Amino acid sequence: MKKFNKFVFLLFVCILLFPLKVYSSVKEKIINNLKETNNLNFDFKQNTNGKIETGNCTLKFPKKIYCLYNNKNKKILVSNGKSLVIKSNNNYNHYPLDKTPLNIILDKKFLINNIKNFDEENKNKKNVNFRFTKNEMKIDIFFDIKNFNLIGWQVLDIYQNLNTTYLTSIIKNQNIEDAIFKIPTQE
């Protein structure tokens, strides 16, 4: 009878701990994938309060991004790691990067350190979601549950603007010229 009780106890412990091991392994795989990722090139679809925009981006850790939008205004978004510029034919907006949600999204060290401490939330069978709150902004970062790649983010800013960006056609660790991250001038 003692052997049976011991077996039942061990079986019970294994059943309880197995999901935790699987759960933590997804986090570890995402962290390891982030550590191995120096840059990404991807197509994107962005929804800002119902306005849909598409384009292509090159992201280089830490904190650099260049995006060319598919629109008639030739909109670009550029961060050199310190500043962020959104420029089009008729607009030029310059921001300190640390005042924007991209400061967090483009900071690999921040993501890794905080993913270690946060719980995962499965949105569905395809994505793993991590939620961060910083400077009155809610930021959700999405990772593919199969290959552990960054596949998007959602930001609710202090003005209650909801911006959701999904990444597709992702290519990792290409040779990238830093010149593309040069802040454009206002013309």
Spans of model-derived segments:
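Sec-dependent signal peptide cleavage junction
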Residues: 25-34, 186-187
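Bacterial N-terminal signal peptides
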Residues: 10-17
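Bacterial N-terminal signal peptides that target proteins for export
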Residues: 1-9
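Boundary at the C-terminal end of the N-terminal hydrophobic targeting segment
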Residues: 19-24
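An acidic-aromatic
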Residues: 57-105, 163
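Flexible, surface-exposed loop/linker segments and immediately adjacent secondary-structure boundaries
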Residues: 89-127
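Gly/Pro-enriched, hydrophobic low-complexity segments
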Residues: 113-187
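A short, Trp-centered hydrophobic/proline-enriched beta-strand micro-motif
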Residues: 32-52
